[in-house]
């Protein structure tokens, strides 16, 4: 599965806009074909990605966009720190299961 993320610091892509923008095949294909930032903004609006005021998405993360291939069946989430997005896989995370009153040590 292809996912668009922006690794550069400053502004994320889907984490600063509509989360569905990370997975939209139309946006991914356009990016892979070399679309410009302005044309991507127009495409996002055509696809219905506008904020609550009807404004187009913020394109600050566009310059650092990349396509990441996620293996089929993988549990993942898009994380963001200071605008830099990254993929976190379930098995790479520290998850705890609540059982009983106290966690067994």
Predicted feature descriptions by range:
Residues 1-105:
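Catalytic phosphate/metal-binding cores of nucleic-acid and nucleotide-processing enzymes, i.e., regions
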């Amino acid at each position: 599965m292809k996912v668009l993320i922006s690794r550069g610091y400053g502004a994320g892509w889907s984490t600063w806009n509509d989360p569905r923008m990370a997975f939209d095949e139309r946006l991914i294909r356009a990016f892979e074909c070399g679309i410009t930032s302005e044309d991507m903004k127009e495409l996002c609006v055509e696809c219905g990605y506008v904020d609550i005021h009807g404004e187009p998405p913020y394109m600050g993360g566009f310059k650092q966009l990349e396509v990441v291939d996620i293996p089929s069946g993988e549990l993942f989430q898009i994380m963001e720190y200071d605008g830099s997005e990254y993929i976190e896989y379930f098995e790479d995370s520290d998850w705890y299961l609540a059982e009983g009153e106290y966690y067994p040590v």
